[in-house]
Amino acid sequence: MQGRSSAWLVKHELVHRSLGFDYQGIETLQIKPEDWYSIAVISYVYGYNYLRSQCAYDVAPGGLLASVYHLTRIQYGVDQPEEVCIKVFAPRGNPRIPSVFWIWKSADFQERESYDMFGISYDNHPRLKRILMPESWIGWPLRKDYIAPDFYEIQDAY
């Protein structure tokens, strides 16, 4: 079954894959990393001007990493928002996805957190650096293959 967003992308010959609908009826689409930035710009122009959230997850140990974007479009009133979920999968060895910071400013800290926890590099992000972990931290703590260190010394802030 094809949703409204998928039908619109097909009409404009934009490459994607429909992953169906979640329990709330929100359509989920898969976009390739190399197509993501252009589709993000087009989605913004189409009316998806609110990035509700961005997150990431590890699909499987040794598998792909995913960056997930929840976009909202309000056309007929605030009580009837149109939402879409976009998933962009990247290989674990070199996870690179174009940043959407320049489209939706709210992606700033969210992409930084995904970088900090999963090691996904967001190309053209203006301040892509660790946000939760110390700069000296080694590894990506939320990856399924991450091995936690036995000891980590945190220096006093005073």
Swiss-Prot record:
One Gene Ontology MF term: quinone binding
Family matches, as Gene3D superfamilies: NADH:ubiquinone oxidoreductase, 30kDa subunit
Catalytic activity: a plastoquinone + NADH + (n+1) H(+)(in) = a plastoquinol + NAD(+) + n H(+)(out); a plastoquinone + NADPH + (n+1) H(+)(in) = a plastoquinol + NADP(+) + n H(+)(out)
Pfam families recorded: Complex1_30kDa
Any one GO BP annotation for this protein: photosynthesis, light reaction
EC number, as in UniProt: 7.1.1.-
Localization terms from the record: Plastid, Chloroplast thylakoid membrane
GO cellular-component term (any): chloroplast thylakoid membrane
Family: Belongs to the complex I 30 kDa subunit family.
Subunit organization: NDH is composed of at least 16 different subunits, 5 of which are encoded in the nucleus.
Function: NDH shuttles electrons from NAD(P)H:plastoquinone, via FMN and iron-sulfur (Fe-S) centers, to quinones in the photosynthetic chain and possibly in a chloroplast respiratory chain. The immediate electron acceptor for the enzyme in this species is believed to be plastoquinone. Couples the redox reaction to proton translocation, and thus conserves the redox energy in a proton gradient.
Name this polypeptide is given: NAD(P)H-quinone oxidoreductase subunit J, chloroplastic
Organism per entry: Ceratophyllum demersum (Rigid hornwort)
Name of encoding gene: ndhJ
